[in-house]
Amino acid sequence: NIKNWKVAYSMNLGFFEIDKEVEKNTIDILDRLKDLGATVEEVKINWNKKELEDTCYNYYAHLFANSIADLMPEHEDELTDYAKDVGLTATIINEALVKRKKIKHSSMGIDLGMTLFECNKVAGKMYEEFGPIIHEYDSFICPTLSIPAVKADINLFEDKVVINGKEIASPDLGWTLCYPFNMLCRLPVLSIPSGLASNGVPTGVQIVGKPYEDIPVFQVGYQLEQLEPWYKTNQFKPNI
């Protein structure tokens, strides 16, 4: 029961371009929360887009990219374009750290060469902004992706991603609202369907909770699932 809960939401986390169908389906979810007795309030998040994107690349490189870089000499033909770029990112960062000088990623305009300590400092700044919000409310809602889908064969480093007629500057990160919460990894996050887009692909929302408090996140997801039991509805099952 989430009656009398306070739920915060942000449609774009402050800087994402959001597809109109994603926005509509997110609003539908917020309306369902109101039907369940929750109070829903919009909040403003002042995160720096460029700082987050730079940090995300560097942070991921420190976490796992070096292991991919080690595989490239013998297994490059088995890796996706994305995996190869991640491995290349690791080698650029290692070079930048040795030279103690930032190097700009040629295809993305990302500044590489942040230490893991510097990445964690940015994550700390992010939490200074978001922490007071999540502690004031019982839960936080935002879209999972800003578009219903990208093409299955998209090359994230060469192809364009257009949302609402606007080409977004970061075709790899500019449509996924997940990565900020990957950097704030102490926060439990559950993604659930929010509805269908006109192309038949489901859209989603993220339910974010307080640090290490998983149960309230599942409570919100469970209550919404009872209103729309996706797994029982034939219209959402593939015709195979």
Regions found by a protein language model. Name each.
Residues 14-15, 209-213:
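A generic structural motif
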